[in-house]
Amino acid sequence: MNRYVLALDLGASSGRAMLAAYDGEKIRLREVHRFSNDPVAKDGRLYWNVPQLMREIEQGMQAAYEIAPYESIAIDTWGVDYGLLKADGTLLELPRHYRDSRTSGILKKAEESITAADLYARTGTQVMEINTLFQLICDQESGRLDDCEVMLPMPDLFAYLLTGTVSTERSIASTTQMVSAKTGTWDEELLSLFHIPHRILPEIVESGTDKGTLSPAVQQRLGLPAIRVAAVCGHDTQCAAFAAPAKTERHIFLSCGTWSLFGTELEQPVLTEQAAALALSNEVGYGKKVTLLKNIIGLWLLQESRREYARQGENYSFAEIETMARQCHEPSCY
């Protein structure tokens, strides 16, 4: 007899709902809903359209339950972005997109308080201005954190909107550049350097634990029972790394998407000057395994090209764009 679970996989350009059936030996996957993830621009700023994404998530949940009564739900997303909740549990504003320009130049300013080398040694995370830490510095300087009750990374935000439960899973927390590579806890000393209040940071929970069940309001709205929502690796890269069909303990992987991640799994983080110089990042995966990886630009340029074609009324598939590129007689970059 099959048992069913639902995976909600949200990337920076698209999302999907995958129904998994387990018969005791094999897991079979079925895509039941796919949707685009289109940011919204307003007043020169770029935001994630969380209300629309929630509508797509709920549509996927309903479509999957019509096929099979799944027992639990899990969510993963891209890294570094987050939502700020007010005391009444509502969003302070739509979550900012990591490609929003507000963090431009923030690294130079941050180095007045801590060097990039010291920051890497503390967190093991590649120092990039899009990281959660630097986004929160901008929020703190603008006064936005004054009205914030809690900060939730994106997978935990969606789980909260389904359950009402506040926590963050370890893998997604490790992308924030605010977790100590040595202790695995929020680095309070680092946060104090930038006057980021520790009170807004949620409890870090392990992958494989429960987030809770669908809230009564969600159950009533969608016509679903009290389905369990599990905390899995919230960062999509760590889900991919864990699922990679490696035959040995020592292996490398390449996870392709908007970003492509090239890396390997280790028992301990690599915090050396050489690793920092090579722009390697230490993230935490399932079972507290460390993933040492390199961020690569990935398919973002292709995705944006397709989006621009669509704006012009040309709805090319990725396969069609590939064919067009192969037929190009001047394969130069400009």
What are these model-derived regions, one by one?
Residues 1-93, 121, 147, 219-229:
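N-terminal glycine/serine-rich phosphate-binding loop of ATP-dependent small-molecule kinases
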Residues 43-46, 116-126, 200:
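Short glycine/proline- and acidic residue-enriched helix-loop micro-motifs
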Residues 194-207:
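A conserved helix-loop-beta module that forms one wall/lid of the active-site cleft
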Residues 6-7, 19, 104, 111-123, ...:
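Active-site core segments that coordinate phosphate-bearing ligands/cofactors
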Residues 62-99, 123-130, 141, 159-180, ...:
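Short beta-strand-loop/turn "lid" adjacent to the catalytic site in phosphate-handling enzymes
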Residues 34-35, 96-103, 174, 258-260:
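Short, acidic/turn-prone active-site loops that include or flank metal/cofactor-
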